[in-house]
């Protein structure tokens, strides 16, 4: 359900992200992201999930999720701008990522890579590394260890 409470989004059989209208139960209204727009490095992205930012102008997409523990996963994250119709990697230098999530105002995205926390400013595109001490099975910043997922 979108913020207006009237529209919803879903994947069409053709692989497009489409916006439908609940009031007349139709999904023919508008293609938000066409399947042909989801090409990265000459390969079709198979989207496993997506999330809109607060003003619903950007879509965070993830592909090729790989399980870490019971509930956690790492994936390749992308941002799609609905105004410019531009697709970009969340951060190609630090990929795959875990737990990518919008800030409450939708202007930044935080994510985990290599047990360190990063933040991407969506306006400037600048990625900032927040922690420097992440180490596999030793120091885990921003996420849980396997034992927490078992409890």
Go through each PLM region and give its residues:
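Beta-propeller folds
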Residues: 1-151
């Amino acid at each position: 359900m979108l913020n207006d409470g009237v529209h919803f989004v879903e994947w069409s059989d053709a692989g497009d992200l489409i916006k439908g209208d609940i009031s007349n139960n139709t999904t023919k209204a508008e293609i938000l992201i066409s399947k042909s727009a989801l090409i990265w490095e000459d390969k079709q992205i198979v989207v496993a999930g997506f999330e809109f930012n607060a003003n619903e102008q950007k879509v965070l997409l993830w592909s090729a999720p790989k399980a870490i523990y019971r509930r956690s996963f790492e994936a390749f994250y992308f941002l799609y701008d609905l105004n410019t119709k531009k697709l970009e990697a969340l951060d190609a230098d630090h990929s795959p990522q875990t737990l990518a999530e919008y800030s409450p105002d939708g202007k930044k995205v935080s994510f985990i890579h290599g047990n360190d926390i990063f933040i991407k400013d969506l306006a400037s595109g600048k990625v900032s590394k927040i922690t420097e001490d992440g180490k596999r099975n030793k120091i885990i910043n921003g996420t849980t260890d396997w034992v927490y997922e078992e409890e």
